[in-house]
């Protein structure tokens, strides 16, 4: 059997989404951005919205998504992606408009824009990548860093008496009357290692 005999549509288990280009990903090992990029591309293709999708990405690691997905992109100032998405959606209501934001952007400087866009019930999708740390700038504590989690700026772990509690953005968003849908997902793989040693 040749390679051509095997690689046929009816034999394929996986196929890279056509919206994903061949640029090598620059993300750190173990980072979930690439997995989320693939999921976004698959959903846009399934919806048949390739020509009508507009993504907004601000700063941090999230901004580089435009290097990997071949759709229309607009960069936003730090924390302002929901405001820009609102403007684009109001100008072009037939577009699939979404933001792609990290925790430093959405849960820190962009908290106001996020909360107000949700509370107004803007017809946009916000994809929030929460890795609980400022990954691009050296591993500093983020607004979502977990209690006890060690970072370069909290080497003994997040202490609620010094740093307060982590913001639970999905919980906050779910309580706003304008929010249509909130879900929290994990895109990491958990491996269980066992030892056969007696």
Q: What are these model-predicted stretches?
A:
Residues 8-12, 17-77:
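Active-site diphosphate/adenylate-binding microenvironment
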Residues 15, 142-192:
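Conserved thiamine diphosphate
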Residues 27-29, 99-101, 181-186:
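Short catalytic-loop micro-motif centered on adjacent basic/acidic residues
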Residues 34-39, 79-83, 92, 112, ...:
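Conserved active-site and cofactor/substrate-binding residues in soluble primary-metabolism enzymes
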Residues 53-55, 95-98, 123-127, 171, ...:
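Structural motif
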Residues 59-135:
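Thiamine diphosphate
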Residues 112-116, 136-150:
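Active-site-proximal loop->helix
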Residues 193-198:
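Conserved small/polar residues in nucleotide/adenosyl-binding loops
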């Amino acid at each position: 059997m040749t390679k051509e005999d095997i690689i046929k549509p009816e034999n394929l288990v996986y196929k890279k989404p056509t919206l994903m280009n061949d640029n090598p990903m620059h993300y750190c090992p173990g980072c979930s951005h690439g997995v989320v990029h693939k999921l976004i591309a698959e959903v846009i293709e399934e919806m048949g919205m390739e020509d009508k999708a507009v993504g907004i990405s601000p700063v941090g690691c999230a901004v580089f998504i435009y290097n990997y997905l071949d759709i229309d992109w607009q960069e936003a100032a730090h924390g302002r992606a929901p405001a820009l998405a609102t403007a684009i959606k109001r100008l072009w209501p037939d577009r699939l408009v979404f933001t792609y934001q990290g925790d430093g952007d959405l849960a820190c400087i962009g908290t106001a824009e996020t909360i107000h866009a949700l509370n107004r019930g803007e017809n946009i999708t916000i994809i929030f990548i929460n890795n609980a740390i400022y990954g691009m700038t050296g591993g500093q504590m983020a607004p979502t860093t977990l209690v006890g989690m060690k970072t370069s700026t909290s080497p003994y772990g997040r202490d609620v008496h010094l740093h307060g509690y982590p913001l639970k953005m999905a919980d906050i968003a779910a309580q706003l009357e304008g929010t249509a849908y909130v879900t929290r997902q994990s895109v990491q793989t958990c491996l269980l290692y066992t030892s056969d040693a007696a």
